[in-house]
Structure formats: structure tokens, C-alpha cells
């Protein structure tokens, strides 16, 4: 099952499930979840191949929707779903295939259309970063700056880089994404 974090207590208001976008994680939504959890329970997930959730070669919207279905089923009642970007697409598939599990659906930063966006360049940049030799995330930023000029995008990607004495790694399954 997906890694899930829960904020707030169960109330009479429908729970909210927040689903992050590509290259993100539930961590991106924690501050918002905390702020809106005073009157309802809020759940944030790490989608497959992201954050602390499992890795799988199948990264289709259908498989992601099935993962979300398992989460909602474990909560034992329909939820409101906020889906951002990739998470929005997976949430749309979830709502179409399982309308009984979704009370309300809020989609952020994506439309129900087929996009021609290709993330292979960004994935290649991350895969080619020599992470084994890094001791600080700031060192990775200096290297990435040579091929990726957008400061905000670099910072976003580097949130998923784990620097550890036990070995550095991405919290992204770059081969599946």
C-alpha cells in the first residue's frame, strides 16, 4: 500500500485525500494538510515510485488509481480528493472508475486531456547526476545548475535526493517515471 500521513481527527466533515504530482511527494502538501485539518481529517500520500512508497515498473494512471482505491477502501468511507498534476490525472481515473469512493473531486494544474509533455530530459538529468560522490545537497545543486537553469525546478527535484552515510539515493523510481 502507499505511504500515507494523516493530519487532524475524524469529524462529521468528509476526509480529504491529497494526491501529489510528478516528481513530488506527500511532503509537498504537509503544511497545507496541517493548516486545513482543524475541522476534518486530511490524508497525504506518496504515490507509487515517489517518496516512501513502493516502486513498480507500471506507472500508469490506471494502476495509480487502483492504489488510491485501496487507500480509500481502508478508510471505510468516501473521501474528497484533491489531485495535483499527475495526481490529478490518477484521481480523475479513480473517480470515473469508482464514483462511490469519491465525494468531491478537486483537480489542480492539469486538464482531462492527453498531453505531449515529455519528462525524459529531466529524468535523464537526474539519472546522470553522480549522486554516489555527494556529501551535501548543495553540491548536487551546483552540478545540476550546469544543465538545469531553473532554480525552483532544481530545488523541487533535489527534495527527492537523499544524502546519507548509508548511501545516497533518489526517492523517485526514475526508470519507471
Identify what each model region corresponds to.
Residues 83-87, 91:
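Gly/Ala-rich beta-loop-alpha elbow adjacent to hydrolase catalytic centers
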Residues 1-17, 37-40, 76:
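Alpha/beta-hydrolase fold catalytic core
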Residues 30, 34, 43-82:
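Active-site loop/oxyanion-hole signature of alpha/beta-hydrolase fold enzymes
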Residues 23, 47-51, 112:
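Alpha/beta-hydrolase active-site loop signature
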Residues 92-96, 103-135:
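Flexible "cap/lid" loop of the alpha/beta hydrolase fold
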Residues 132-177:
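Conserved alpha/beta-hydrolase catalytic His-Asp/Glu region
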Residues 21-24, 85:
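Active-site glycine-rich loops that stabilize anionic/oxyanionic intermediates
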Amino acid at each position: 500500500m502507499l505511504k500515507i500521513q494523516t493530519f487532524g481527527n475524524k469529524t462529521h466533515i468528509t476526509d480529504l485525500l491529497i494526491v501529489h504530482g510528478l516528481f513530488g511527494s506527500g511532503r509537498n502538501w504537509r503544511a497545507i494538510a496541517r493548516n486545513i485539518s482543524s475541522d476534518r481529517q486530511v490524508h497525504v500520500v506518496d504515490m507509487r515510485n515517489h517518496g516512501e512508497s513502493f516502486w513498480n515498473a507500471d506507472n500508469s494512471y490506471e494502476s495509480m488509481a487502483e492504489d488510491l482505491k485501496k487507500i480509500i477502501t481502508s478508510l471505510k468511507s468516501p473521501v474528497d480528493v484533491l489531485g495535483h498534476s499527475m495526481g490529478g490525472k490518477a484521481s480523475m481515473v479513480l473517480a470515473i472508475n469508482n464514483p462511490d469512493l469519491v465525494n468531491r473531486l478537486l483537480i489542480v494544474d492539469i486538464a482531462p486531456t492527453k498531453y505531449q509533455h515529455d519528462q525524459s530530459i529531466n529524468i535523464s538529468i537526474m539519472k546522470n547526476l553522480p549522486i554516489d560522490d555527494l556529501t551535501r545537497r548543495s553540491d548536487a545543486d551546483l552540478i545540476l545548475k550546469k544543465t538545469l537553469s531553473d532554480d525552483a525546478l532544481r530545488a523541487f527535484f533535489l527534495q527527492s535526493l537523499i544524502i546519507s552515510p548509508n548511501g545516497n539515493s533518489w526517492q523517485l523510481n526514475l526508470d519507471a517515471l
